[in-house]
Amino acid sequence: MKIFDCFPFFNEIPLLDMRLNYLNKIVDKFVIVEGTHSHQGKLKKLYYDENKSLFKKYENKIIHIIQNSYPNHLGDTHSNFIYDYHTRNGISKGLKKCLDDDIILISDVDEFPDVDKFSLFNGNLTIFKQLMFYFKFNLRVKNFDHDNGDGLWPGTRMLNFKMFKNMTNVQKIRNTKVKKYAWWRFD
């Protein structure tokens, strides 16, 4: 069984460095999906490619996926979400060699799961509820719409590859167990 940490990447170089360093001892592969377009549909440079020398010590663990095809929805009311979702969907391109029992983490680059909670994983889709911070670690958010006021962000998703391949059953998502205080998010 291997652990694959999967996330879209825009340009958050310091957060990427923190994430790779923090999860390096437990993760077998990092699947970094970088789009050629911003969430607004504008062309963007590939920041990971420009800075990959900074991450040389992780190069044998990194699978860098370049998402370069997008639906033509620029100008639609929700086009920013369409570009974001389409980039995130590129994660599957980096999981071609996975086995059914491999563990898949799906996050944003700024969502840091508590690795001590990984042992609680029982094969069901799991959502880590994470502490959330804005801009600095002393600016914790304690009340926002996603969490009924408990200051926890529904962040990292953990599931096995067998479930990932068959993500058509919405009921499995509804039955998710939430791990409280399973780490933090830094925006």
Predicted regions and their residues:
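Active-site-proximal specificity loops/subdomain of glycosyltransferases
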Residues: 37-106, 115-116
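Short loop->beta transition adjacent to catalytic acidic/histidine clusters or analogous donor-positioning motifs
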Residues: 3, 24-38, 59-63
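Conserved acidic residues
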Residues: 3, 28, 102, 110, ...
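Short, surface-exposed basic-aromatic patches at helix termini and helix-loop junctions that form
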Residues: 19-28, 118-125
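Hydrophobic/aromatic beta-strand patches that form the interior of the parallel beta-sheet core
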Residues: 31, 63-65, 105, 126, ...
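N-proximal low-complexity "stem/linker" segments adjacent to membrane-targeting elements
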Residues: 1-25
